[in-house]
Amino acid sequence: MKILLIGYGAMNQRVARLAEEKGHEIVGVIEPTPRATTPYQQYQHIADVKDADVAIDFSNPNLLFPLLDEEFHLPLVVATTGEKEKLLNKLDELSQNMPVFFSANMSYGVHALTKILAAAVPLLDDFDIELTEAHHNKKVDAPSGTLEKLYDVIVSLKENVTPVYDRHELNEKRQPQDIGIHSIRGGTIVGEHEVLFAGTDETIQITHRAQSKDIFANGAIQAAERLVNKPNGFYTFDNL
């Protein structure tokens, strides 16, 4: 499989290493500005790369959105987070002409977490729910795209839900419809996501901890391996 990388930060550097270990080839990199330290051919536009089988994106909205407005037809794996609604609308449009895969978290374990959460929410309908995510001190966006995904699962199953990001100015007791959302940034934490169900005299916690960023890179590669054989359409872990 010949892979074009969109962005060449820490994540796509891992994708390159792991993909080559699997026998795949990196045919180029798209970066906002050329860098002498990038060990692959650099491009400005997706359409300039003629021999790629798939593109894998671990970048940011500033780089990705202008590229998505260009004319190209290439299977696309997208892991960028930020401006989610705008991104999903654009990817849905592109999926009419190419296979597109998107996940806010490329770990299959996190996908499993969403399924566990979907089963737990109806069973624990009268429990309070608090969501917490923790990441390294270099992560810019908060809350994480993954936590937003977990929140979306809850919203799809409960009525009149209210996200609460900060309680220090509320000066009132917790309301039944509140969903607490908390972000922690520090050190080199790869990624942790926890769902707390708090009931009367008991609590239940569901936690996913990433031990290495390799799980995200491998997840993107595995998605790409499947996507190249798919017809045009919008894919997630649910239908890939």
UniProtKB/Swiss-Prot annotation:
Q: Subcellular localization, per the record?
A: Cytoplasm
Q: Does the keyword NADP apply?
A: yes
Keyword Amino-acid biosynthesis assigned = yes
Catalytic activity annotation: (S)-2,3,4,5-tetrahydrodipicolinate + NAD(+) + H2O = (2S,4S)-4-hydroxy-2,3,4,5-tetrahydrodipicolinate + NADH + H(+); (S)-2,3,4,5-tetrahydrodipicolinate + NADP(+) + H2O = (2S,4S)-4-hydroxy-2,3,4,5-tetrahydrodipicolinate + NADPH + H(+)
Query: What is the main EC category here?
Result: oxidoreductase
Pathway per the UniProt entry: Amino-acid biosynthesis; L-lysine biosynthesis via DAP pathway; (S)-tetrahydrodipicolinate from L-aspartate: step 4/4
Q: What GO cellular component entries does it have?
A: cytosol
Which residues act catalytically here?
135, 139
Which positions bind NAD(+)?
A: 79-81, 103-106
**This enzyme's EC code(s):** 1.17.1.8
**UniProt signal peptide:** none
- Annotated keywords: Amino-acid biosynthesis, Cytoplasm, Diaminopimelate biosynthesis, Lysine biosynthesis, NAD, NADP, Oxidoreductase
NCBIfam families, from UniProt? dapB (TIGR00036)
Task: Name the protein family.
Answer: Belongs to the DapB family.
Please give the PANTHER family that the UniProt record associates with this protein: 4-HYDROXY-TETRAHYDRODIPICOLINATE REDUCTASE, DIHYDRODIPICOLINATE REDUCTASE
Instruction: Give the protein name, as stated in the record.
Output: 4-hydroxy-tetrahydrodipicolinate reductase
Source lineage: Bacteria, Bacillati, Bacillota, Bacilli, Bacillales
